[in-house]
Amino acid sequence: MRASQWFLVTQKETPNDAEIASHQLMLRSGMIRKLGSGLYTWMPLGLRVLRKVENIVREEMNKTHAMELLMPSVQPAELWQETGRWETFGGQLLTMKDSNQREYCFGPTHEEVITDIMRNELQSYKQLPVNFYQIQTKFRDEIRPRFGVMRAREFIMKDAYSFHLSLESLQETYKDMYQAYCRIFDRMGLKYRAVEADTGAIGGSASHEFQVLAESGEDLIFYSDASDYAANIEQATSLKPLKANQPCNETITLVDTPNQKTIDEVASFLGIASNQTIKTLIVKGKEHPMVALVLRGDDELNEVKAIKHPLVHAPLSFIDEELILKTLKTPLGSIGPIQLNIPVIVDHHALAMPSFVCGANQADKHFINAAWERDAKYDDAYDLRNVKEGDPSPDGKGTLHCCRGIEVGHVFQLGDKYAKAMNASVINEQGQLQTMIMGCYGLGITRVVAAAIEQHHDEHGIIWPQALAPFQVNIIPLNGARSQAVKEQAESLYQQLKSHGIDVLLDDRNERAGVLFADNDLIGIPHRLVVSERNLEQGCVEYKARISSETQLINLDKVVNFIIELINK
């Protein structure tokens, strides 16, 4: 491609509304242009990258024998009403009516559609297992779209769906897709982790997220330094602590704590550390109006874990202070588990404390030297807390460390959630109707592009991994308009590299060298060749890798093979 014939428009200044590096650099390099809130046009440069992502994904999906199809973006409401998600999916579901007042949504995902197709197409166990995928535009009506294409309202996803009759078959396909995702991100040159994850609104029994590691990532990931264990903050657990061996021999004592309402205030007032206290949170229960969740004072409640307890209502709902005072006759800052008279669920780390300070269920009073069993009773012990850096890994191997990541893929073992709701069954080997079970496998095509930039950039611009770069090589002829020798040599290199199937940009624009070099760094082309009169006098061209600050001279008769070897590494 010749730059003079290409739509290459870059910006020096960073747009004011671009908060993160990928958003800034995609706008400055001319990859995208904003149309509206969370809506972006992919310009020719950005589309080249997007297509490379799609091609890698498509190749690896085809290797798993998944079959590509394309489903409608607009979906009938009645399909979503069958599964109950029309009401529960929330405000991100963009709904509409046609001229006959029939309701539809613009699909944020396609579980209902694919299940409807398969319940009509599949009749026998002999047709299973099957796995279908599509690469298609989705829409989620984000209240606050931000970070460019990282959290846009319209985006492109690869979503795949598999159908099975046995858990063993589902697990086999799940493993194949998991490995395919690993190959995809390996080929893209991304540093990532596959982590255990909560199934969330999609549902199911097991899932993994694929997280591209980046300091700007919104997700917290915990991983062991001595094993393969890794999980996101919602799902991460640590080794269950042992209960104290020695009983508390100190006498429980009631003390005044005037106007001390928070854990930090109580701990400071009593001259102790916050990890010597416990806190009691009152939430709505499934069968009881109120349930108490008890954690160590320095721990944070993990709401995703909490709502998985059978006594806790989902979504999690904290009881307001006025109702607590009216019902429990205790102000919020003085609540504790002793004689509380509502179900008490205690976190394992709080239960392991030999003694603790807690609210006394009297205004401005706390107990010191309180102990479980002797003084405080509980209904169940449960993992309620967010893990912390330095916690022991749950597999007993090493300690947990924390990093940030950007979720770019998510695989689920759905089970029969959708098939059962939509009556998707086939005849099994015994001649009986059996509900199918499903897996689903999502990968954010547009998000991968932004995540790659977040991981691969510097102060000058993007540093593309070779597999994703819009062009692999940029040839810059200096003063090509005035020097026939420079022009001819640049053209010769351009044609030779093209003949070897290499994506080459010949930057033949009539611009100053500084502008051409700056644009190359901004766009992030991995390999730069500079053809100049001075270098030609030495029989060389100048080579520079985008990832390096060093330049080197390469003999003209060796430069093509030099580039080919670099690209094929």
Curated annotation (Swiss-Prot):
PROSITE patterns assigned: AA_TRNA_LIGASE_II
Xref: Gene3D superfamilies: Anticodon-binding domain (3.40.50.800), Bira Bifunctional Protein, Domain 2 (3.30.930.10)
Top EC category: ligase
Alphabetical UniProt keywords: Aminoacyl-tRNA synthetase, ATP-binding, Cytoplasm, Ligase, Nucleotide-binding, Protein biosynthesis
Main location group: cytoplasm
Gene Ontology CC: cytosol
Subcellular location field: Cytoplasm
Catalytic activity: tRNA(Pro) + L-proline + ATP = L-prolyl-tRNA(Pro) + AMP + diphosphate
GO molecular function: aminoacyl-tRNA deacylase activity; ATP binding; proline-tRNA ligase activity
Stored NCBIfam families: PRK09194.1 (NF006625), proS_fam_II (TIGR00409)
Function: Catalyzes the attachment of proline to tRNA(Pro) in a two-step reaction: proline is first activated by ATP to form Pro-AMP and then transferred to the acceptor end of tRNA(Pro). As ProRS can inadvertently accommodate and process non-cognate amino acids such as alanine and cysteine, to avoid such errors it has two additional distinct editing activities against alanine. One activity is designated as 'pretransfer' editing and involves the tRNA(Pro)-independent hydrolysis of activated Ala-AMP.
HAMAP family in the record: Pro_tRNA_synth_type1
Comment, domains: Consists of three domains: the N-terminal catalytic domain, the editing domain and the C-terminal anticodon-binding domain.
Entry's family note: Belongs to the class-II aminoacyl-tRNA synthetase family. ProS type 1 subfamily.
Subunit text: Homodimer.
Stated name of the protein: Proline--tRNA ligase
Native source organism of the sequence: Legionella pneumophila subsp. pneumophila (strain Philadelphia 1 / ATCC 33152 / DSM 7513)
Gene: proS
